[in-house]
Curated annotation (Swiss-Prot):
Signal peptide: none annotated. The lineage of its organism: Eukaryota, Amoebozoa, Evosea, Eumycetozoa, Myxogastria. Ca(2+) 1 binds at residues 21, 23, 25, 27, 32. This is Calmodulin. SMART domains: EFh.
Length: 149
């Protein structure tokens, strides 16, 4: 399943993995997973975090290494995003709940994830998804972007 991933996808997943792997030791712990999820406005219990790790922890050592992370991502991609997952993701970005993702909201979420982006990079991300050219991303544009990746 992992062999169906492109080099570009693997590189993107490596970048995502390093956002989770705060101490850079090559493993994601429940603590690191919790930190990232809380920065995205989620509030998982310790048991839920452990369950998430156990789901993909092939060698049973209690953490997720990059090959396990890749397997999980490949599985998730094969099991394409449900509308519910996309709606939840949209809500994470749409902080004020007005139905649009502004550049400021996008920057806020990316910064919480530890991703420092320049104004140009944020504007570029908005432009790529902003089909109607109003300078922000509405739900339909967000769905198109999520399904086209």
């Amino acid at each position: 399943m992992v062999d169906s991933l492109t080099e570009e996808q693997i590189a993107e997943f490596k970048e995502a993995f390093s956002l989770f792997d705060k101490d850079g030791d090559g493993n994601i712990t429940t603590k690191e997973l919790g930190t990232v999820m809380r920065s995205l406005g989620q509030n998982p219990t310790e048991a839920e975090l452990q369950d998430m790790i156990n789901e993909v922890d092939a060698d049973g050592n209690g953490t997720i290494d990059f090959p396990e992370f890749l397997t999980m991502m490949a599985r998730k991609m094969a099991d394409t995003d449900t509308e519910e997952e996309i709606r939840e993701a949209f809500k994470v970005f749409d902080k004020d709940g007005n139905g649009f993702i502004s550049a400021a909201e996008l920057r806020h979420v990316m910064t919480n994830l530890g991703e420092k982006l320049s104004d140009e990079e944020v504007d570029e991300m908005i432009r790529e998804a902003d089909v109607d050219g109003d300078g922000q991303v509405n739900y339909d544009e967000f769905v198109k972007m999520m399904l086209s990746k």
